[in-house]
Amino acid sequence: MLLEVALIEKKDDGVRIERKVRYRPKPVIEAIGPKKVPPEFFAFIETSTWDRNKKELKFVNVPTSHKISSMMENTGVLRLREAGGQCERTMDGEIKLKLPFFLKPLAMVGEAVIQREGLKILDAELPVLNRFIAEVVRAPK
């Protein structure tokens, strides 16, 4: 669940839309061991480019916390394509946590949690995306 979405920057050249958006999801982890995790650790900036011709969105998500951004990489591509008179959405992405050797087992758990929560966000955005497809992607030219 997203607590905040703020558009920081948007450029539209007619073919591509470049944007930066700040997201602050609801924290899913309150503590790691005895240490509390501040809610701001979950905030991130999405830098993305939507290519109208390719119907493709390339993105990089960078945590706003410097401490977290040095330990995490998240990139991906979202594609829309015609599929039997309907629109198919596919997403390829990578979440990588760069932790010290002795914390490597936590990286696998952390990556799985981040992926699960990211999929929840994608599911919640589906009604909005369906409207976007109807009004923008399939709009008469």
Residue ranges and their predicted role:
Residues 1-27:
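Hydrophobic ligand-binding cavity/cleft-lining segments
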Residues 26-32, 57-64:
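Short Pro/Gly-enriched beta-strand edge/turn motifs at strand-loop
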Residues 2-5, 34, 82-85:
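Short, mixed-charge, low-aromatic patches
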Residues 11-13, 53, 83:
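Structural motif
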Residues 52, 106-140:
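A conserved amphipathic terminal alpha-helix motif
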Residues 17-20, 37-39, 43-44, 49, ...:
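Beta-strand/loop substructures that line and gate deep hydrophobic ligand-binding cavities in soluble
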Residues 3, 30, 131-134:
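Polar/charged alpha-helical tracts
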